[in-house]
Structure formats: structure tokens, C-alpha cells
Amino acid sequence: MQQSESSSAQFDVAVIGSGPGGYEAALHAARHGMKVCLVEKASLGGVCVNWGCIPTKALLRSAEVYDLAKNPSEFGVNVSELSFDLAQAVKRSRKVSLKSSKGVEFMLKKAKVEVWRGEAVLTGSKGVKVTAEDGSERSLEAANIIVATGAQPRVIPGLEPDGKKIITSREALILKDVPESMIVVGGGAIGVEMAWFYAKAGAKVTIVELMPRLLPAEEAEVSEALKRSFEKVDITVQCGAKLGNVAISEFGVNADLLAEGKEPQKIEASCMLVAVGVTGVIDGLGLDAAGIETERGFIRTDELCRTSASGIYAIGDVRGGMLLAHKASAEAAIAVEAIAGKLPEPLSEPLIPRCVYAQPSVASVGLTEEAAIAAGYKVLVGRSQFAASGKANAYGQLEGFVKLVFNAETGKMLGGHLIGHDAVELIGELGLACRYGVTAEGLVGTVHAHPTLSETVREAAFAALQSKG
């Protein structure tokens, strides 16, 4: 039954979507004493908790444990009859996701955020209609609305997913069996992580990336190191290439591989994972009714996450830019502070850390050397290999390095780039250094615990100082 306009529930803030941006916005607004409603049509936590960050990392951990167990004798451990159980890995992954989702539910309840289940449609700049799964409807009005609906996999014409032969990252998280072979279209973060997981699980994997290298937004040296590492474990990497004709049969997928300056080549696999980016979840949201402008599949906003409609904000993936959960969380705080009448500091995208969780893992923050030079900086660069680290040697994980980029004139850090086992865990220090302009001397003068991988950061800073002559 449709409620009348006069019976609409009243809130200070309504949040549409419960991913890292949405639930953080709701919690932050509640801490400000605002009456908050959060609307979610699926599981609390959004894609990140249920079909993205969290379950992916759980699967990657399973593959990492399996990989370590395949070579245990060096560590004095004897293992026999080793095998990889994908069903159990998926089961654990789903359990981890469910626990995280329940955690979000607990936090919202504790903060007295009212959660409405259903599909939200904007009915104006202040109104939202929510349709529950059973078809029942109710309405709310809010002084401010935050749209945090996230994003969904981009579909390429001719590569429409069928959930079996052509899949997205969502299906890749719950496959029943390890495919004999897999073509991964896209060498970004999702493609790289899924390629590594399924290769370690036993599939023969080929990555096809249109750009000249894997992780094209990252430091070139890091991308090349990752490619070499992947090729050592028999992952075929085809960069500067695209797919031509794609055919599906009962046996799998075959396609023409097209690379500039090379003859077309036939490739085939049991299935194909398409991971070529995402587009904002905006269809059916009622953006026109609210007067909200979009651009290339995302909601257009200013630096404080304000849309073209007064009182409506957009945060996270639906806003575009870097598609990262922690960026969404940071934008949640910005939007709520703006609603509260504060003057929040706009987010600087270069200072947002980027992480890729294959092994070796990749992490970066700030400018690459190339970008810094292009921006007009004179740079000072320092590098240090993890192979020189006592901790890395003790763990038998020698791959990778740290590369730091400094402003040669001021000495302040401009960017930090890492590749190595669990290198992502070091990015916090580098993010802090970039944000506050820490110098190479400052990093060297900071005592780093021994033995830790973080000592490699200090050694890279020391190398930069030595290069000054």
C-alpha cells in the first residue's frame, strides 16, 4: 500500500546504500546527534563486505596457505596428500563475509540508525520511496540525502556475462570447481587478484590487458616486477592486446587475441572472467526527479561530495574517481561534516593509498616518478630490495622492493611504491609521510623495529639520501 506524502517518516539524514561509504556516513551522522535512516536492498556492508574486498581477501588467503604448504620441507614441515578444496575455501570466504556483515548490523543498531530494507527511489530533493522485497512501500523525507549505491561490473558488448562461461568477479567468488583454464580480461586490481588466486588453485590462467602493462596506473617498475613474478608461476600475461571474435561452446570459450604488430592468435579456456572496470549504480534511482546530474555513468559532485541537487550528496564508487572502499569511507566523513555545517578538508586523490592483494602484493600512495616529473618536480629516488631484509629472509619471502620518490628541492616525500609479500601492510607509514611532507632524513631518523619489513622503507629513504652525493 502506498503511503500518503503526509505520513512520510522524517529524518535529518537518509543514506542510500550500506557499503563502507554508506554505513560510515550513517554512523558519523549519528555521532553528530542526527536522526538517521539507512536504506539497503541487499546484505548490509555492500559489495565490499559481501562480494568484493572481504571475501576476495579470504579466498586469496586460502590460496596463500596452499601455496606455502606446497613447499614446507624447507621450513622443517612434512606434508603429504596435499590438495586444494575450492568448496571449503569458498565456504570460509562466505562465512567471513557474513561475520563482517553482522558486524555492520551491530554497529548501526548500537548507533540507533534506523535501517529500512528495500529498493530506494528519490522522489525529489528531500523524498525517498522504499519498496520492500514483498512489494510493500513506505516513504521518508530527509533534510539531507547521501547516495552511496556503489558500482557494478562494466559490461562489454560481445562479452555479456552468462554466469558460467563468461563471468564477473561476483561469480568468480563462488565457483564450484577450479576451471582447467581461465582467460582474465583486464589487468587491473580485480583481474590481477583473481588471476593469481585461480592460478594458485590450479587453473592455467591468461591475462589480457589492453594497456601496455599490468596495473597501468602504478609505478612502471612495479608493474614489470609483477609481470615477471606472474610469469614465474605460469600465468600468461598479454599486455597491449585485446580480444577479437569470441565464441562460446559447451567446452568453454575461444577468442582471437589481437596485438599491434603481431599476427592474430587463437586462445581458449574453460571460462572467461571479465574485469574491465565498473559503472555507477544509478539506474532506477530517480536521479532526474531529484535534479541530479551524471557524467559517464557516475554522479557528478563537487569536492565536498555535493551533487547538483541541494541537500543531496554522493559518495564512494557511485561518485566515480578512484573506486576504493577507504576512499568511500573518507568521503562519508566529508559529506557528513559538510551537512553539519563544518568546513571539511577536501580529499586529495593522490594521497589515497592503492593496494592489490595478490602475492607479491602491490601498494602505492602519492605520485609515481613519471607523474612527479611530468608535474614539474625535480625528483630524488631511493630503492631498497626486500631480499636485503632479515625479516623477509626469515620468512623466505625475498621478492620485491620499496621505491620512494622525493622532491629534490624541498626533500619532502611525493610518493611511495611497494611490491612484495604483504607489502600492503607498510602503506600506512608512506601515506602519512606523503600527507605531511616527511623528508628522507625524517624517515631515516625514525627508529624502525628490527626485524620488520618496515626497515626496508628506511633503507629506501637512506638510498635516496646517498644518491644526492
Swiss-Prot record:
Coiled coil: none
Pfam families recorded: Pyr_redox_2, Pyr_redox_dim
Catalytic activity, as annotated: N(6)-[(R)-dihydrolipoyl]-L-lysyl-[protein] + NAD(+) = N(6)-[(R)-lipoyl]-L-lysyl-[protein] + NADH + H(+)
Gene3D superfamilies, A to Z: 3.30.390.30, FAD/NAD(P)-binding domain
Molecular function terms from GO: dihydrolipoyl dehydrogenase (NADH) activity; flavin adenine dinucleotide binding
Superkingdom in the source lineage: Bacteria
SUPFAM superfamilies: FAD/NAD(P)-binding domain, FAD/NAD-linked reductases, dimerisation (C-terminal) domain
Subunit comment: Homodimer.
Record's function text: Lipoamide dehydrogenase is a component of the alpha-ketoacid dehydrogenase complexes.
Protein name: Dihydrolipoyl dehydrogenase
Gene name per UniProt: lpd
